[in-house]
Amino acid sequence: MNIDCLCRWVVLPLLRYPLLVALVLRWSLSDSISICLTIYTLLINAFLIANSYIKRSGQVAWKSLREFKNGIVLITGGSKGLGRAIVSQLLQDYSNLTILNVDICPSSVRNTRVKDLICDLSDDEEVAALLNLLKRKYKNEIRLIVNNAGVRANFTGFNGMERDNLDKIFKINTFAPLQFIQELAPSRHSTRQCYIVNIASILGILTPAKVAAYAASKAALIAFHQSYSFELQNEGVRNIRTLLVTPGQLNTEMFAGFKPPRQFFAPVIDITTLAAKIVRYCELGQRGQLNEPFYCSFAHLLMCVPYSLQRIVRSFSRIDCCLPDE
């Protein structure tokens, strides 16, 4: 049991359908309160339905990935962790897609539709050579780009950061996604449909101690993604849609080795569950942001509250003192 379960099964139903909850629980309500709750329920659900429609709609109908006979999916960092879970989910859901996995090591997923492209994303020459290959052989068939690859430095204080590590982290976490989008996304006037997913991190918003380099690289990715998305929206681009994923801690190797505090409020996310949600968004062509777990939807709000409240929340959550020294 955690806060996500309570919100999903108690808080959100109560907020969306208060009158229905009252009827189920046989609460005694006056006529005026019942009318107000009915109007509220209709308005809030109308807004949520309209919001979902806007995120998924466009002047041109969005095609299912199943409609592309020789569709190509490009994913970085698909050999382990969340990337591997996304690859497995795509293979399970679609029999028509070929997946190009860009990683420093081969994928452990054994399938003829998965093609490994070995590349160190921190090496400029290797990235340039790979991009030339992709543009020559696959560019016009790429329907989905998932920028998932990410690395972190050792957990260390601000003064312990090294320039070489900073360069490597930013090249992989920030600059590589930009290059892949710039070189492989369709032009604004093309008819080729393409969905772009950038996997960031809630640490790019909350910026805890000892992960300054990683948090900064993800913060930069978030800013680049949002600016790019608003640019597409402003220019009326119809064939490109984007999704920003800002997860909390995942059950992967990257942040393994310590027990996260306050898991009731900040539960560790199962990568299989998150991968299924990401693939579902890809299928629907849903724009916007995917935040998991629940608290991630309020991270920006936390960073906007008065300093004293921030200190209280951060002290309670132990976000700045939970990471070990490495």
Curated annotation (Swiss-Prot):
- Primary location: mitochondrion
InterPro entries recorded for this chain? NAD(P)-bd_dom_sf (IPR036291), Sc_DH/Rdtase_CS (IPR020904), SDR_fam (IPR002347)
Task: Say yes or no: keyword Transmembrane helix present.
Answer: yes
Gene Ontology CC terms, in alphabetical order: endoplasmic reticulum; mitochondrial membrane; mitochondrion
Q: Keywords assigned by UniProt?
A: Membrane, Mitochondrion, NADP, Oxidoreductase, Transmembrane, Transmembrane helix
What Gene3D superfamilies does the annotation carry? NAD(P)-binding Rossmann-like Domain
Q: What class of enzyme is it?
A: oxidoreductase
Active site located where?
Y214 (proton acceptor), K218 (lowers pka of active site tyr)
| List of residues binding NADP(+) | D120, N148, Y214, K218, T252
The entry's function note states: Involved in the resistance to DNA-damaging agents.
The record's misc note reads:
Present with 2130 molecules/cell in log phase SD medium.
The family annotation for this protein states: Belongs to the short-chain dehydrogenases/reductases (SDR) family.
- Protein name (record): Uncharacterized oxidoreductase TDA5
Q: Which organism is it from?
A: Saccharomyces cerevisiae (strain ATCC 204508 / S288c) (Baker's yeast)
| Species lineage | Eukaryota, Fungi, Dikarya, Ascomycota, Saccharomycotina
